[in-house]
Amino acid sequence: MSPSDVPINWKRNLTVTWLGCFLTGAAFSLVMPFLPLYVEQLGVTGHSALNMWSGLVFSITFLFSAIASPFWGGLADRKGRKIMLLRSALGMAIVMLLMGMAQNIWQFLILRALLGLLGGFIPNANALIATQAPRHKSGWALGTLSTGGVSGALLGPLAGGLLADHYGLRPVFFITASVLFICFLLTFFFIRENFLPVSKKEMLHVREVVASLKNPRLVLSLFVTTLIIQVATGSIAPILTLYVRELAGNVSNIAFISGMIASVPGVAALLSAPRLGKLGDRIGPEKILIVALIISVLLLIPMSFVQTPWQLALLRFLLGAADGALLPAVQTLLVYNSTNQIAGRIFSYNQSFRDIGNVTGPLMGAAISASYGFRAVFCVTAGVVLFNAIYSWNSLRRRRLAIE
């Protein structure tokens, strides 16, 4: 029996990749609460300079990730997904270690760019599970996997803040590097993949990748949907604390209240993603996607009219429950409309669109709030999501008509 014929326990791989995504999500978000403080510690002074450099070191990671993702996706299709998971976990661990040793802001900026270049654990984990899970269970599998990164991202800021308070800023980077190295070890020892390497000559070029897709227009619309999801999430991030302060008035625990309101969508997504993924396997991810987008619009609009922080928290919890269905539904549809041969590149292209959304969303939110106020951000974001719902529905309708 050849190595490629050995059966794979995809559920065990799902468990290990879930842990890897959890650790990666936690590692990335561990340093987020004090990123501006670390920038200040590296010698940046003045309000405007601090804002500029904090924005740069935050966004440059996503920018370089968007550039590098297609390259790593192509390499994953040639060499296998496990080796890309190992490369990503070890590379990020080394970069995080070096970040804790940075002596000036330029070194830190370069290392943040390197983090984006060497990242990609989560999209490669998605590609691995997408190619191993049975098609009729891919919605549940990808929905479950998505909760790993969400769980880590929820716990990371809390743990990072506590660690920074007790041990200082630099040690948190060393702890984060250790967490990523554990992720590397878990992947090395426990993930199994049957993959026959493909020579560079046998690799499909971009034009051939597009030609091999069952419905290229639909796949493009799914990429755009991923971008819009991140734009919608990111547009609210820069103004959330300030909006909560406006709603709450003069209260002493504004940081706690805004932190709780920031985290409730993640908790809701954690609860809803596997269940809605399983429902998508039964009724079709297309229906889940469109309904979740419409519900998101209906929840975003009243957010601009709330009068108390608790009204906002309730709406954001419901929004998180709907959002928990979106990315897994997109990923399941990508699985349905591509082959295992190109899965790495398709998921990496999707990651690039996600990273672009991560960069543009906060910029859009900040620009709208500066010109028209906080409440306008929710209305404009609702309009963007509504456009995406119509665009996605039209793309899915065209595919259905083409099949008929």
UniProtKB/Swiss-Prot annotation:
The keyword Transmembrane applies. Coiled coil: none annotated. GO terms for cellular component: plasma membrane. Keywords: Cell inner membrane, Cell membrane, Membrane, Transmembrane, Transmembrane helix, Transport. It is a multi-pass membrane protein. One of its GO terms (molecular function) is transmembrane transporter activity. Belongs to the major facilitator superfamily. DHA1 family. MdtG (TC 2.A.1.2.20) subfamily. This is Multidrug resistance protein MdtG. The gene is mdtG.
